[in-house]
Regions:
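Conserved nucleotide-binding/hydrolysis micro-motifs of P-loop NTPases
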Residues: 37, 258-259, 286-287, 311-314, ...
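Conserved S-adenosyl-L-methionine
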Residues: 196-308, 313-317, 321-324, 329-336, ...
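Conserved NTP-handling cores and scaffolds of large molecular machines
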Residues: 22, 38, 44, 185, ...
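Conserved Class I SAM-dependent methyltransferase catalytic core
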Residues: 17, 23-39, 338-413
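Hydrophobic alpha-helix feature that most strongly marks membrane-spanning transmembrane helices
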Residues: 242, 269, 273, 311, ...
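Non-catalytic, mostly N-terminal accessory regions of nucleic-acid modification and defense proteins
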Residues: 1-209, 214, 219, 282-285, ...
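Flexible, glycine-/basic-rich loop-and-beta segments that form/coincide
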Residues: 402-480, 484-500
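Hydrophobic alpha-helical scaffolding
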Residues: 150, 171, 227, 250-257, ...
């Protein structure tokens, strides 16, 4: 069984190997297009199998071909009634694979297959859902970028076809494995394409923020993205709905770029969205307002949710059509002004707002300039605020997008806000981790944004609820720093403390965690030196020991540990009995939510750090393992081993080879450490001896390099040299053996040479023993995987998933205490040396200098 992560790695590795020098933004159309055609072929065969009542082991390609010869259009018509499309037997993806294996492959057949598919669906009502997906303007198999001649192009396409050949796209569609792999590839292509990716990709973390906020704000049956790109925003919103609500959800979107428009349709279909539940249009969103209600032409169709990531500061927003838009356009009329020609940000916002239902929620990504720029944009912003549409503004980190490094914000808009409701401003610009070239929101950053929005909480330095009066006082300027003060963690220097010594008591009062947790311990460690200043009467190291060993801290740690133990006990049964991949996301969300609730009951613990720990466990182990458990069962998965494939060679010789076996969910190293502890210790002992031996040899080499030493005279010529005759870091064993024959036994030379020879022999012997014992241990582990008992699997998997969890969460109790103790140490060092100390030191140096001068004799 293959997991989603393994599919992603395999496909992206294949893409990198196959695309050569072709631009990533172009190659994606070929790869994703053929991946989608494989899906269409597999769905055709699955529908035929179900309709014909054939068993799973049937040769579906052969059965389908024979049935088509008998029934012809009656068969394909029946399949089309179910799917909205069909692929003819001779044009199945599987027929390409068969031709390749038989040596009969022709590139023309692929082109014919793609063209025939489009012709066959053109006469049906679902034609718009598939029209143009495989047009030659998108997938041009004659493009020289695929190869300089027909043979090279044919080889490259054959390799690409084989990349998907053994994947059952129908099986992978269950649990969204296929859709997730497709989205992953889009993201990877976007990362590789850099600035060229801007038109089709919104980073997953930004989509998550927008989707979670929208879902928690409205009851959603229809969703619209006017600049839909790859469709990831629409799908992310859908993912956060219940299964029943997902089935009822209708997806709408519009996209200007044809290639990107195709990505959307394929993406939705691969995620299991039925054609009748999606309406995607290829066109200019602003110039061609869509969708329209024929019965209410001046109102436009309204949706429960609107999400979008439009082009930033689009300078051509009103120049792409013959007739420029006017302020009388119903989308803009309420505002009485058009955005400036050079910046189309508000044009997209007003378009989306026009299509937002009265009880709906809109989330849009915008550059920060819309928050404070004047002129027409200032007037539009004022109207938005006067109409009470702006619900929240979320400032995100810079450099999150592949196509721009500028910081952006997410604006949330609603039409049904209470008149007195404030505007929430969140500054999350410093909450991220850097991965490669991009800044990325962590799971905890997303959770904190969403929780702050839902609960409308104010946090110093992070969020603020701005009243109407505040906003008017700021002349409708919504620049986030005007409302959310950036926290400066640098402690202000105290002049008196520098002059006279002592730590300011106001700085001690700022140690909130120490004061609220162990105030008496802190107070006892301080001695007053004068009013407003104290000094430490013990080292910070001793104070740290006292604080961490205090009964209150230890009891709190025990309570937290007990809560975590109960938490894991409650979820263990669910995790080990999961039987459907569709359950995983709900289970993940439940574990994350419960961890937040548990930690929120304790003071001075960073709830979101605990949240991130659970998120990382899911990312690193649980998602992979639970996919296998859902398909195989817990104990069967525990006793399953897989070939350990490693990549060897480079260039055309690059290939994969099996080197042993690995446990599907139970790691080999855990089996070794827990069930073969004696063997592991024996190998460790041998490695320690090897390290000692190598150390002794290294010392002799260094001595031999030292001129005028006995070792230099005897051993220097026996050190290995490079081509420039420079000594290296080891002896030449052949020269050592030869030299031993030339010296007298019992001589100093002989004893030293014998010592080197013995050490080298010992090193060789130890290496051999280590290799043999490691090989024996590996073999034992390979055999043991399939023989693990249920109890062993319970213990080993628990250790793998949660072995370090309790300690990591308990550390959240100690971490804020340690941070403040570090601050105290910094303050102590800062004010340890006073002005009088410096003056005294200066006098001492001057006195020593004068003494030296007096000793000088002038001759």
């Amino acid at each position: 069984m293959i997991t989603s992560e393994e599919i992603k790695r395999r496909l992206w590795s294949g893409a990198n190997d196959l695309r050569g020098s072709m631009d990533a933004s172009r190659y994606k159309d070929y790869m994703l297009g053929l991946m989608f055609y494989k899906f269409l072929s597999d769905k055709t065969l699955e529908t035929f199998q179900a309709t014909a009542g054939l068993p799973k082991e049937a040769d579906l390609v052969q059965e389908y071909s024979q049935a088509y010869e008998k029934l012809g259009e009656n068969l394909t018509g029946m399949i089309q009634e179910v799917l909205g499309y069909y692929v003819l037997p001779e044009h199945l993806y599987q027929s390409w694979v068969k031709d390749i294996r038989n040596g009969d492959f022709e590139l023309q057949k692929v082109m014919d297959s793609l063209n025939t598919f489009e012709r066959n669906i053109a006469v049906k009502g679902d034609a718009d859902d598939f029209k143009g997906l495989f047009s030659t303007s998108i997938i041009d198999l004659t493009d020289s970028a695929l190869g300089s001649d027909l043979n090279k192009r044919s080889k490259n396409i054959k390799d690409l076809i084989f990349l998907f050949a053994d994947l059952n796209m129908v099986d992978l569609q269950d649990g969204d494995v296929l859709g997730d792999a497709y989205e992953y590839l889009i993201g990877q292509f976007a990362s590789s394409a850099g600035k060229k990716a801007g038109e089709f990709y919104t980073p997953r973390q930004v989509s998550e923020v927008m989707a979670q906020i929208v879902v928690k704000s409205s009851k959603i049956k229809s969703i619209y993205d006017p600049t839909v790109g790859s469709g990831s925003l629409l799908l992310t919103v859908g993912k956060h709905l219940t299964k029943n609500d997902q089935r009822d959800l209708h997806y709408y979107g519009q996209e200007y770029i044809t290639e990107t428009y195709n990505l959307t349709r394929m993406n939705l279909l691969l995620h299991g969205v039925r054609p009748e539940k999606m309406d995607i249009k290829n066109g200019n969103t602003l110039a061609q307002d869509w969708p329209e209600d024929p019965e209410r032409p001046d109102e436009g169709v309204q949706f429960d949710a609107v999400v979008m990531n439009p082009p930033y500061s689009d300078q051509k927003w009103n120049k792409r059509e013959d007739k420029p838009l006017k302020v009388s356009d119903p989308r803009f009329a309420d505002f009485g002004v058009l955005p400036p020609d050079s910046k189309g940000d508000f044009a997209y916002l007003m378009h989306g707002l026009y299509h937002l239902g009265q009880k709906g929620t809109m989330a849009i990504v915008l550059p920060h300039g819309v928050l404070f720029r004047g002129g027409a944009e200032g007037e539009i912003r004022k109207r938005l605020l006067e109409k009470n549409y702006v619900d929240a503004i979320i400032g995100l980190p810079s450099n999150m997008f592949t196509n721009t490094g500028i910081p952006v914000c997410v604006m949330i808009l609603k039409k049904n806000r209470e008149l007195s409701a404030p505007v929430l401003l969140i500054d999350s610009s410093e909450h991220f981790v850097k991965i490669g070239k991009q800044n990325v929101l962590r799971e905890k950053d997303i959770a904190q944004i969403v929780d702050t929005f839902v609960n409308k909480t104010e946090t110093k330095g992070y969020s603020h609820l701005a009243t109407r009066e505040e906003i008017i006082a700021n002349e409708y300027n919504l620049n986030i720093p005007r409302y959310v003060e950036t926290l400066d963690n640098e402690i202000v220097q105290d002049v008196d403390a520098h002059l006279l010594g002592g730590i300011p008591t106001k700085n001690i009062a700022d140690l909130k965690v120490l004061n609220s947790s162990v105030k008496d311990v802190l107070d006892e460690s301080l001695t007053p030196v004068r009013e407003g200043y104290v000094k430490l009467n013990k080292s910070v190291a001793d104070l740290t020991d006292e604080v961490l060993e205090d009964e209150r801290v230890k009891n709190k740690s025990i309570k937290v540990a007990t809560k975590i133990k109960d938490y894991l006990h409650d979820y263990w049964q669910e995790l080990t009995t999961v039987d459907s991949e569709t359950e995983l996301e709900n289970l993940r969300q439940a574990m994350l939510s419960d961890m937040k609730q548990i930690l929120a009951t304790f003071d001075n613990i960073d709830v979101y750090s605990g949240y991130q720990i659970i998120a990382e466990i899911w990312k690193n182990t649980l998602t992979h393992d639970l996919e296998l458990i859902a398909g195989l069962g817990f104990y069967n998965a525990g006793r399953t081993r897989e070939a350990n494939m490693v990549t060897k060679g480079t260039g055309q010789k690059k290939h994969e080879e099996q080197t042993g076996w690995i446990g599907a969910i139970v790691p080999n190293d855990l089996i070794a450490q827990n069930l073969y502890a004696e063997q592991v210790q024996s190998i460790a002992n041998l490695k320690n001896k090897l390290t000692e031996t190598e150390g002794s040899l290294s010392e002799l080499v260094e001595s031999a390099k030292t001129e005028d030493s006995d070792e230099n005279v005897i051993l220097y010529d026996l050190i290995k040299k490079n081509k420039d005759d420079e000594p290296q870091d080891s002896f030449d064993n052949k020269k050592i053996k030869a030299e031993l024959k030339n010296v007298d036994k019992g001589s100093t030379d002989y004893d030293l040479l014998k010592k080197v020879s013995s050490l080298m022999n010992q090193k060789t012997k130890l290496n051999t023993e280590i290799k043999n014992e490691e090989k024996a241990l590996e073999g034992a582990v390979y055999e043991r995987i399939e023989k693990l008992t249920d109890a062993e699997i319970d213990s080993l998997v628990y250790q793998k998933w949660f072995g370090g969890l309790k300690a990591a969460i308990v550390n959240l109790v100690k971490e804020p205490l340690k941070n403040e103790l570090q601050t105290l140490d910094t303050l102590n060092e800062r004010y340890a040396t006073t002005l009088s100390d410096l003056e005294e030191e200066t006098k001492k140096v001057e006195s020593e200098f004068e003494s030296l001068l007096s000793e000088l004799v002038v001759r």
